[in-house]
Amino acid sequence: EIILVGEMRDKETVDIGLKAALTGHLVFSTLHTNDAPSSITRLQNMGTPDYLISAACTLVLAQRLARKTCSECREPDPDVTPKVLEDFGFTPEQASRAKILRGKGCPRCKDTGYKGRMGVYEVLNITKPIKEAILAKATTPELREIAIKEGFRTMSDMGRDMILGGDLNFREFDRILSMD
């Protein structure tokens, strides 16, 4: 059985959703946070007991919607230097080899440089170490650190891959991820 809860805005809604998950229901809902690990902290700040979060949550997905660089008018972006890329988390090797693209504008994209949209997301699997960290009242940075050791990739990681693939331009990456 699947339950969809529009948005978890208060403790009562959270408790109902998580208790339904404990009874074997697959519960989908939304919660406004900047990233996946801070969803756990938000639930704690709403007064949800740690044992309930740890037992009921199996996965948290955080996402942003980005404009896709137009494939018809892509061209190298001369304004994005390796130094700028390194400042945004690219390795020196990635930054020196990267051919960063932008859309210059064409009839297909109505001179915007963008055509279509795509998701930039991160998926936090609630593994045993994450459950233990929740019960130990770990902070958001601590949860993120544990998750990264478990293979977690942030939205920034995914965004950097999309930039290197040419689908996301640097300005759009900065726009959607500077919201944090």
Describe the function of each predicted region:
Residues E1-D180:
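Short, flexible helix-loop junctions that flank or precede catalytic/ligand sites
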